[in-house]
Amino acid sequence: MKPIQSPSGVASPMKNRLRKRPDLSLPLPHRDVALAVPLPLPPPSSSSSAPASSSAISTNISAAKSLSELERVNRIGSGAGGTVYKVIHTPTSRPFALKVIYGNHEDTVRRQICREIEILRSVDHPNVVKCHDMFDHNGEIQVLLEFMDQGSLEGAHIWQEQELADLSRQILSGLAYLHRRHIVHRDIKPSNLLINSAKNVKIADFGVSRILAQTMDPCNSSVGTIAYMSPERINTDLNHGRYDGYAGDVWSLGVSILEFYLGRFPFAVSRQGDWASLMCAICMSQPPEAPATASQEFRHFVSCCLQSDPPKRWSAQQLLQHPFILKATGGPNLRQMLPPPRPLPSAS
């Protein structure tokens, strides 16, 4: 920590004070030079008239949008960490979503976000919301995202299995793509699954939101997010302290899909209940199951997602080949791919 210096022209009352013990001095704290890394600056703007308080963090200048060219239309979502606005890029009249993340973040967090944003900009999949750009404006981090005109799937009730299978296929396609790129979402839930008027479903809120969540007090985290966490993520003792983020994403997907089918949170407690009730329900009870009225394929699909033992869960890529998913495309002899039913007890 640097000592506080008096402003120029103002005499310090301590300046001419005589030292009673000149042979004594306070030890200076050790400073690790490896930590003295300056915050990376954005690339210089091609126009000298650009405002200094707003800059785009981007290496692809042709894809960058100036923040001054974005006109806010209305607020489309908000939470503890920030607000999402629908904006229009005035030169092209193209709509985008602008996520404004509040808070003064430490330099280390900003450096990490700068590195992560380049990864997010390279993500290109029809079932993943595209990250176009990022701005640092007056201390606020603002992320320019693809606009999904129908919003999130939170509160959706999708009881028709054909429609639910197609929706699941799209989510799994995006999730398998992220996993192949070694990206773990860590927050799959209905509010992070967006849909547009063309019925395209896309995964949102990964990457930067994950980094920021790591810097926040866990006591300030959303209970709704806890509701979709896997048991071993909440209680690390369940899997000997090992956490597989890919398997955790699959669990969260399974809870979300079952919630769509039932039209309610699938556990015996409220999704917005207290932490203790949620954690007991998730970690100590049996995983929820699809009702007996559902098809055999769907019941098995949910079971493959919601295995208590993480290694027994199917991967996103494997689930894409599950009979419930293939049924949406009309694949033949799908029941032959399911395990045989349990034998009935003998009458003797």
UniProtKB/Swiss-Prot annotation:
The modification Phosphothreonine is found at residues 215, 225. Its EC number is 2.7.12.2. Transmembrane segments: none annotated. InterPro entries: Kinase-like_dom_sf, Prot_kinase_dom, Protein_kinase_ATP_BS, Ser/Thr_kinase_AS, Ser_Thr_kinase. GO terms for biological process: abscisic acid-activated signaling pathway; cell division; defense response to other organism; floral organ abscission; inflorescence development; plant-type hypersensitive response; positive regulation of ethylene biosynthetic process; regulation of root meristem growth. Residues 70-325 form the Protein kinase domain. Activated through serine and threonine phosphorylation by MEKK1 and MAPKKK20 in response to abscisic acid (ABA). Inhibited through phosphorylation by GSK3/Shaggy-like kinase ASKs. Inhibited through ADP-Ribosylation by P.syringae HopF2. Activated after high light stress. The modification ADP-ribosylarginine is found at residue 313. Signal peptide: none annotated. The modification Phosphoserine is found at residues 6, 221. Interacts with P.syringae type III effector HopF2. Interacts with BZR1. Interacts with MPK6 and MPK3. Interacts with RACK1A, RACK1B and RACK1C. Interacts with MAPKKK5 mainly in the cytosol. Binds to BASL. Interacts with MAPKKK20. This is Mitogen-activated protein kinase kinase 5. It comes from Arabidopsis thaliana (Mouse-ear cress).
